[in-house]
From Swiss-Prot:
The lineage of its organism: Bacteria, Thermotogati, Deinococcota, Deinococci, Deinococcales. This is Large ribosomal subunit protein uL3. Part of the 50S ribosomal subunit. Forms a cluster with proteins L14 and L19. GO terms for cellular component: cytosolic large ribosomal subunit. Disulfide bonds: none annotated. Belongs to the universal ribosomal protein uL3 family. One of its GO terms (biological process) is translation.
């Protein structure tokens, strides 16, 4: 059985463990009410739907409001499913994780707007000198000749960068502060401060 929780990225800091400083990301995680339980009998798979961050009923449409009332919980800003997770009780708190445990963190990366191929895809660019003129940051050739006579799908080119779902795997839980609903994770987590973060048990079972 896997486990997971929703939270908000607070920011990064460092704490001392013994005689060394450890960089950590602070996440305000939970409490997350259980909004729906899905079973193989009714839905074809096992999952639980968790909510996070209450919001006003005025901001909820009628179908959503009925969904929340059926579960007996206040309207939530975020709803996410966790497969093969069967929590005990009606609320999931940050204490489902323990210090030293490995987790996967999923967030939405920071938006960078429209960027060229050097920043977006780490292209080398053109020559800086020796006759090069207005070619320093260009991508170069993007195709072949009359055959195939088109640019292949997926060709790495300039365009919108960031604002994508990113998962960082096998991050270590440095500290859990259950009384404050805080979890301190070693290293960086994708996204801006205040963004939604999904924390799940490590899929690859990191050591």
């Amino acid at each position: 059985m896997t486990k997971g929780i929703l939270g908000t990225k607070i920011g990064m800091t460092q704490i001392w463990k013994g005689d060394r400083a450890v960089p950590v990301t602070v996440v305000l995680a939970g409490p997350c009410p259980v909004v729906q339980r899905k079973t193989k009998l009714t839905d074809g798979y096992e999952a639980v739907q968790l909510g996070f961050a209450p919001k006003s009923e005025k901001r909820v449409n009628r179908p959503e409001l009925g969904h929340f009332k059926k579960a007996g919980v206040a309207p939530m800003r975020f709803l996410r499913e966790f497969r093969d997770f069967a929590p005990e009780g009606d609320t999931v708190n940050v204490d489902i994780f323990a210090e030293g445990e490995k987790i996967d963190a999923t967030g939405t990366s920071k938006g960078k707007g429209t960027q060229g191929v050097m920043k977006r895809w780490n292209f080398a660019g053109g020559p800086a000198s020796h006759g090069s003129k207005k070619w320093h940051r260009r991508p170069g050739s993007i195709g072949q000749r009359k055959t195939p006579g088109r640019v292949y799908k997926g060709k790495r080119m300039a365009g919108h960068m960031g604002m994508e779902r990113v998962t960082v795997q096998n991050l270590e839980v440095v500290e859990v502060r259950a009384d404050e609903n805080l979890i301190l994770v070693k290293g960086a987590i994708p996204g801006a401060n205040g963004g939604l973060v999904m924390l799940r048990q490590a899929a690859k079972g990191g050591k």
